[in-house]
A protein has these predicted regions:
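Short, flexible helix-to-coil linker/hinge segments that flank and couple to helix-turn-helix
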Residues: 99-104, 108-109, 113-162, 166, ...
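Acidic catalytic/metal-coordinating carboxylates
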Residues: 38-41, 64-70
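Receiver (REC) domain active-site loop signature in two-component systems and cognate sites
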Residues: 60
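Conserved acidic segment of CheY-like receiver
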Residues: 3-24, 160
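Recognition helix of helix-turn-helix DNA-binding domains
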Residues: 174-209
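Active-site beta3 strand of CheY-like receiver
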Residues: 49-55
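Active-site residues of response regulator receiver
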Residues: 11, 57, 91
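Short hydrophobic/Thr-rich beta-strand motif most characteristic of the beta2 strand and flanking loop
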Residues: 29-37, 45, 204
Length: 221
């Protein structure tokens, strides 16, 4: 039997936390691992209960969601985990600078707080499998503003094969594995293998980090 996706709900509004908790618990294959009302307690609970997905509000007292995300993905914390944790940030603004910063720190995407319960649960499942949750156009607009002066391309990128670079560019454009497979005339399993190699060589966590890497180093289309 497949283990349920364990979700940590982080928001300073108790009513919102309670509502999300009800939605998650009602879904087959999901459970609530805990709740927190600020970033400091969120970081502590991630270490204690090791959730699969964190729903992270951006604007909270004590410690906001951006700083909490940064601390969650500190190398020393990541090294202690037996499985990866994904962070999905929640915001009331479509193009939010704080969301872009959280994505740079390791978040897998962002959702507006007025999404439907179905969209929320689909997003949880998606980030749990390592996908990004946001439209490529939204991500492009966010990252364009963040990386106006790209940094030099690191040696790790130069280690990618020609085919891996083609897949890298396609992921940076927001294409799915199915779309990439059609573009490079390969099977989806081959594309998955290439994506895995890219993540390993560049020391990245997931596809959204490939997009961030592309913008950070001036490799975005």
């Amino acid at each position: 039997m497949t283990e349920p996706i364990r979700v940590l709900v982080v928001d300073d509004q108790e009513l919102f936390r309670a509502g999300v908790e009800v939605i998650v618990e009602a879904q087959e294959g999901m459970s609530v691992a805990g709740t927190a009302g600020d970033g400091m307690n969120a970081v502590r609970l991630v270490d204690e209960v090791n959730p699969d997905v964190v729903l992270m509000d951006l604007r909270m007292p004590e410690m906001d969601g951006v700083e909490a995300t940064r601390q969650i993905f500190l190398p020393q914390r990541v090294a202690r985990r037996v499985k990866p944790v994904r962070v999905l940030v929640l915001t009331t603004f479509n193009l939010d600078d704080k969301a872009a910063t959280a994505i740079r720190y390791g978040a897998s995407g962002f959702l507006l707080k007025d999404v439907t319960p179905l969209m929320l649960c689909d997003a949880i499942r998606s980030v749990h499998t390592g996908n990004a949750v946001l439209a490529p156009t939204d991500l492009s607009a966010l990252l364009d503003a963040q990386f106006r002066a790209p940094t030099p391309v690191p040696d790790s990128y130069l280690s990618l094969t020609q085919k891996e670079r083609a897949v890298f560019a396609a992921v940076a454009r927001g294409l799915s594995n199915t779309e990439i497979a059609a573009e490079i005339f390969a099977s989806e399993s081959t594309v998955k293998t290439h994506v895995g190699a890219i993540l390993r060589k560049l020391a990245l966590r997931d596809r959204v980090q490939i997009v961030v890497f592309a913008y950070e180093h001036g490799l975005a289309p």
